[in-house]
């Protein structure tokens, strides 16, 4: 088992356990900062040692070293800036050497930060050096549109880890996981990083990796922040709990990682390797386009397919963790088995595969997902969380250019929908622009209802749902009406056809 990065596991909770009560009391008297969702993930991995050798949020000297050279000020390899970003108003309220209580959800103190410095980073440099500068990169979008303009650096005193109310038995800290491996006498462990559900191909490639390296398997999925649009972690964890049963007995272990991904490609892959070393893994599977967010709106990839593997491999000796390249496997239907695609002559051997896009389409449309691709229990979980279109909800928002009587159009649509039956709940919901209303719309849609919103709704694009559609004459309307379609009958007909084409209604 490798030593932690930097030589010592920085388990701050264990280090500060004897003074926890005094720290808790002190925190009530200090200025307070409520941590953001990303900061909650970061501080948990600082406090539990997952980010060893870090013992706090980066001060300016360390930050500059990481951004420009992928190294802390003492020369230690570290590729991702871990910063406490705050708005200018809060930054102006604190001074060096001041102590600040850091809270979860505004009420739960998790640590006290001793301020070393407050600085305003050059975000354009961070964006270019760390994430290659494309403004469409999700981390750059976060940097400029969500993160505070000032960073506060300093060391932490641990009060407690952030609280989680789900899967307590699966949330192992680095110290706990290392003890688990020792108790099982696992000195060689290959870690598998994922933010997606796992299917048969993933099981096959991880088993192959274990056999090739004479190691056991750590399934170590991210359950913090991942790429926008990813499947929620509750669905994924249920999948992992089922697929772990499909591994040869005693070969695999499941533990959850509370990481906030940046989708930082090659730099993030090195960061992931460091984290897995801290958790006790001796080997790490690095995938094709590892931790990459795909491509931008012009179809240009943010990272090359092998950038991550090459950068991690270049630091192999310094990382003290062996890189296992992700070998794509494909299904051979004539032999009913999976094999690495680089070993197959596809001109002579028949292969089958289902892409992520095709899988999402089959889930959406209720299409068949064969057992050679995924286990039945996994498919069942995915279908429960991703019902086909006829069982999904939707909301229809009237634009302000509709000229017919809105109340009558609402009644006509409701009456038309109700005659289809099918178990979907339909409701007319007049609007206001309060945030609570936006949340309610999203809840109704996710619960499978059909909503009709007759009043003009300028904030419709703020609803956190993919199935909210506008009706009107404007070019950007989802259901666009021609100038001649001014009767309620014509509009209802157009709406019904739209819903049928998108599989919400089946005849």
Curated annotation (Swiss-Prot):
Pathway: Sulfur metabolism; hydrogen sulfide biosynthesis; sulfite from sulfate: step 1/3. The record marks 199, 202 as: Transition state stabilizer. The gene is MET3. The oligomerization domain is distantly related to APS kinases, but it is not functional and does not bind APS. It is required for oligomerization of the enzyme, although the oligomerization state has no effect on the catalytic activity of the enzyme. ATP binds at residues 193-196, 287-290, 329. Sulfate binds at residues 193, 195, 291. This is Sulfate adenylyltransferase. Residues 1-165 are annotated as: N-terminal. Gene3D superfamilies: HUPs, P-loop containing nucleotide triphosphate hydrolases, Sulfate adenylyltransferase. Catalyzes the first intracellular reaction of sulfate assimilation, forming adenosine-5'-phosphosulfate (APS) from inorganic sulfate and ATP. Plays an important role in sulfate activation as a component of the biosynthesis pathway of sulfur-containing amino acids. Its main location: cytoplasm. It is found in: Cytoplasm. Homohexamer. Dimer of trimers. The active site is at 194, 195, 196. Its EC number is 2.7.7.4. One of its GO terms (biological process) is cysteine biosynthetic process. Residues 392-507 are annotated as: Required for oligomerization. It comes from Candida glabrata (strain ATCC 2001 / BCRC 20586 / JCM 3761 / NBRC 0622 / NRRL Y-65 / CBS 138). One of its GO terms (cellular component) is cytoplasm. It catalyses: sulfate + ATP + H(+) = adenosine 5'-phosphosulfate + diphosphate. Residues 166-391 are annotated as: Catalytic. GO terms for molecular function: ATP binding; sulfate adenylyltransferase (ATP) activity. The record marks 326 as: Induces change in substrate recognition on ATP binding. Keywords: Amino-acid biosynthesis, ATP-binding, Cysteine biosynthesis, Cytoplasm, Methionine biosynthesis, Nucleotide-binding, Nucleotidyltransferase, Transferase.
